[in-house]
Curated annotation (Swiss-Prot):
Keywords noted in UniProt: Bacterial flagellum, Secreted
UniProt record similarity statement: Belongs to the flagella basal body rod proteins family.
Predominant localisation class: secreted
UniProt-listed Pfam families: Flg_bb_rod (PF00460), Flg_bbr_C (PF06429), flgK_1st_1 (PF21158), FlgK_D1 (PF22638)
Gene that this sequence comes from: flgK
Domain of life: Bacteria
Listed name of the protein: Flagellar hook-associated protein 1
One term of GO molecular function: structural molecule activity
Localisation: Secreted; Bacterial flagellum
Gene Ontology CC entries for this record: bacterial-type flagellum hook; extracellular region
Single Gene Ontology BP annotation: bacterial-type flagellum assembly
InterPro entries: Flag_bb_rod_N, Flagellar_basal_body_rod_CS, Flg_bb/hook_C_dom, FlgK, FlgK_D2-like, FlgK_helical
Length: 553
C-alpha cells in the first residue's frame, strides 16, 4: 500500500514541478533574453521484490534550458555586423541629407557667386555690382563654414559616442564577470544544477555587449564565460573584468580613441583598424573612411577655389589703379606630433605651394632613421618623400619643413586642409578693391577706362578651369562629392537592410528553439494538469484501499 502512495506522490511532485516550469515560461514570455525551460522527468530506480524488479515512480532530474549554442553564436555574429553597418549608415545619412539639401547647397552658392561676377564683368565700373559680388562672396564663405561646421560637430559627436560606448562596454564586462562568479558559486551549492535565470541574464548581456564590440566567447569548466574582443584583447577572464578607456589619440589629440587599461603599462592604445566590428567599429570606420574623406574633399575644394581666385585677383588692378590683393583668406595646413615620439620638441610645419596638387587626404609621416615615409590615409599609399634644395619635404603640392632631432619611428600627422575653411574669410571689404582691370589706370602709358574688365573675365574663366586636384572644376568637384556620398549612403543602406534581414532569420531560428510559444505552453499546461489529476486519482485509490483495510474487523 505504501508503494502505491509513494508512486502517486512522486507523480504529483513531478506534475507540480512541470506545471511550475510551464507557468514560469508563460510568465516570462515578454522578457528579453529569456530561454524556454523544460522539466526533465526520469524513472526512479526500481526495487527488487518477490516478483522481480518493481518500479518506484518518477523523479525530477532537472530543469533544462532549451539553448542552442551554435545558432546563438551565429545570431551574435550577424547582430555584430548589423550593428556596425547600421551605425555607419545612420552617420553617413546625416552627411547625405546635408549635401542633398538644395536650399543650403554649396553648389547654389558657387553658382550665385559666379553669376554675380558675370554681372560685374558686364558692368565693371558699377559700384552696386561690385558690392553685390562682395555680398555673394560672403554668402559663399558662410556656406562653406556652415557645411564644415556641421561636419566638425559630427566629429565631436563621434568622440562623445566613443566615450559612451567604452563606458557601456566596461559596465557590461563588470556585470558579466560578476555573473560568472555568482553562477560558479550557485552551481556548486546546487550540486551541479545551473541557475537558469542567471545564465539567461549573462547571455543577454553578452549579446548587448557584442552589438557594441565584437566578442568571442570561450566556456571554461563549470560554465564560466571568458570574453575576448575580436582583436584578441581579453575583456572578461572568469570573475575579473578588464577595462577600456576613451583617451585622446596619440596621433591626433582632437580625436577620441580606445585604449586597453593595463595595470602595469597604463593605457595602451588599440589600433583602430582592429576595432572594426559592432557599433563602436561602425563609428570608427565612419570617421576614418567617410567623415574624414568628406571633410578633406570639402577643404580641398575651398582651398583650390580661394587660392586660384587669389592668384588671379592679385594679377589685376582695382578701381583706384592699385595692384589687386588676396580676395580670400584661407587656413593653413596643420601638423600634429605623435605624443609617443622620442623627442617631444621636434616639430614639422607645412605650407601650400601648389593648391592644384593638394589632395583630399591626411598624411602619416614617419621617420625611418634615414628617410621620411609618407602614407596617404585616404588610400594607404606609402612613398618616400622627396626633398628640395633646402631640405624641405615635397608632398602633393605641399612643402614641409622638418625640425632637427627627429628619432627613428617618430611620426606626425599632416592635415593639409583641416583648417582651410575655419580660417576662410573675405578680405576685400571695399568694392573699389575688386581688381577687375588688367592694367593700372595710374600708369601714364596705359589708356584704360573704368570699364576695363579683362582681369574680371579671367576670374570668371576660373569657373571652368580644372583647378581642384588638377582635374576638376569647382562645380564638378562638388558634384562628385555629393555623388560619392550619395552612392556610399545608398550602398550602406542596402547592406544594412540585408544584414538586418539575416538577423531576423537567425533570430527566428533561435526563437524556434529557445523562445516561448504560448500555444505550445497552453498544450503543456493541459497535459500536465491531466497528469496531475491522474496521479491524484491514484492517491485517492490508495487512500480508499487503506480505509478499506482499516474497516476490516
Amino acid at each position: 500500500m505504501s508503494s502505491l502512495i509513494n508512486h502517486a506522490m512522486s507523480g504529483l511532485n513531478a506534475a507540480q514541478a512541470a506545471l511550475n516550469t510551464v507557468s514560469n515560461n508563460i510568465n516570462n514570455y515578454n522578457v528579453a533574453g529569456y530561454t524556454r525551460q523544460t522539466t526533465i522527468l526520469a524513472q526512479a530506480n526500481s526495487t527488487l521484490g518477490a516478483g522481480g524488479w518493481i518500479g518506484n515512480g518518477v523523479y525530477v532530474s532537472g530543469v533544462q534550458r532549451e539553448y542552442d549554442a551554435f545558432i546563438t553564436n551565429q545570431l551574435r555574429g550577424a547582430q555584430n555586423q548589423s550593428s556596425g553597418l547600421t551605425t555607419r549608415y545612420e552617420q553617413m545619412s546625416k552627411i547625405d541629407n546635408l549635401l542633398a539639401d538644395k536650399s543650403s547647397s554649396l553648389s547654389g552658392s558657387l553658382q550665385s557667386f559666379f553669376t554675380s561676377l558675370q554681372t560685374l564683368v558686364s558692368n565693371a565700373e558699377d559700384p552696386a555690382a561690385r558690392q553685390a559680388l562682395i555680398g555673394k562672396a560672403e554668402g559663399l564663405v558662410n556656406q562653406f563654414k556652415t557645411t564644415d561646421q556641421y561636419l566638425r560637430d559630427q566629429d565631436k559627436q563621434v568622440n562623445i559616442a566613443i566615450g559612451s560606448s567604452v563606458a557601456q562596454i566596461n559596465n557590461y564586462a563588470k556585470q558579466i564577470a560578476n555573473l560568472n562568479d555568482q553562477i560558479s558559486r550557485m552551481t556548486g551549492v546546487g550540486a551541479g544544477a545551473s541557475p537558469n535565470d542567471l545564465l539567461d541574464q549573462r547571455d543577454q548581456l553578452v549579446s548587448e555587449l557584442n552589438k557594441i564590440v565584437g566578442v568571442e566567447v570561450s566556456v571554461q569548466d563549470g560554465g564560466t564565460y571568458n570574453l575576448t574582443m575580436a582583436n584578441g584583447y581579453t575583456l572578461v577572464q572568469g570573475s575579473t573584468a578588464r577595462q577600456l578607456a576613451a583617451v585622446p589619440s596619440s596621433a591626433d589629440p582632437t580625436r577620441t580613441t580606445v585604449a586597453y587599461v593595463d595595470e602595469a603599462a597604463g593605457n595602451i592604445e588599440i589600433p583602430e583598424k582592429l576595432l572594426n566590428t559592432g557599433s563602436l567599429g561602425g563609428l570608427l570606420t565612419f570617421r576614418s573612411q567617410d567623415l574624414d574623406q568628406t571633410r578633406n574633399t570639402l577643404g580641398q575644394l575651398a582651398l583650390a577655389f580661394a587660392d586660384a581666385f587669389n592668384a588671379q585677383h592679385t594679377k589685376g588692378y582695382d578701381a583706384d589703379g592699385n595692384k589687386g590683393k588676396d580676395f580670400f583668406s584661407i587656413g593653413s595646413p596643420v601638423v600634429y606630433s605623435n605624443s609617443n615620439n622620442a623627442d617631444k620638441t621636434v616639430s614639422l610645419t607645412a605650407k601650400v605651394v601648389d593648391s592644384t596638387k593638394v589632395q583630399a587626404t591626411d598624411y602619416k609621416i614617419v621617420f625611418d632613421g634615414t628617410d621620411w615615409q609618407v602614407t596617404r590615409t585616404a588610400d594607404n599609399t606609402t612613398f618616400t618623400a622627396t626633398k628640395d634644395a633646402d631640405g624641405k619635404l615635397e608632398i602633393d603640392g605641399l612643402k614641409v619643413t622638418v625640425g632637427t632631432g627627429a628619432q627613428k619611428n617618430d611620426s606626425f600627422l599632416l592635415k593639409p586642409v583641416s583648417n582651410a575653411i575655419v580660417d576662410m574669410n573675405v578680405k576685400v571689404t571695399n568694392e573699389a578693391e575688386i581688381a577687375m582691370a588688367s592694367e593700372s589706370k595710374l600708369d601714364p602709358d596705359v589708356d584704360t577706362g573704368d570699364s576695363d574688365n579683362r582681369n574680371g573675365q579671367a576670374l570668371l574663366d576660373l569657373q571652368n578651369s580644372n583647378v581642384v586636384g588638377g582635374n576638376k572644376t569647382f562645380n564638378d568637384a562638388y558634384a562628385t562629392l555629393v555623388s560619392d556620398v550619395g552612392n556610399k549612403t545608398s550602398t550602406l543602406k542596402t547592406s544594412s537592410t540585408t544584414q538586418a534581414n539575416v538577423v531576423k532569420q537567425l533570430y527566428k531560428q533561435q526563437q524556434s528553439v529557445s523562445g516561448v510559444n504560448l500555444d505550445e505552453e497552453y498544450g503543456n499546461l493541459q497535459r500536465y494538469q491531466q497528469y496531475y489529476l491522474a496521479n491524484a486519482q491514484v492517491l485517492q485509490t490508495a487512500n480508499a484501499l487503506f480505509d478499506a483495510l482499516l474497516n476490516i474487523r
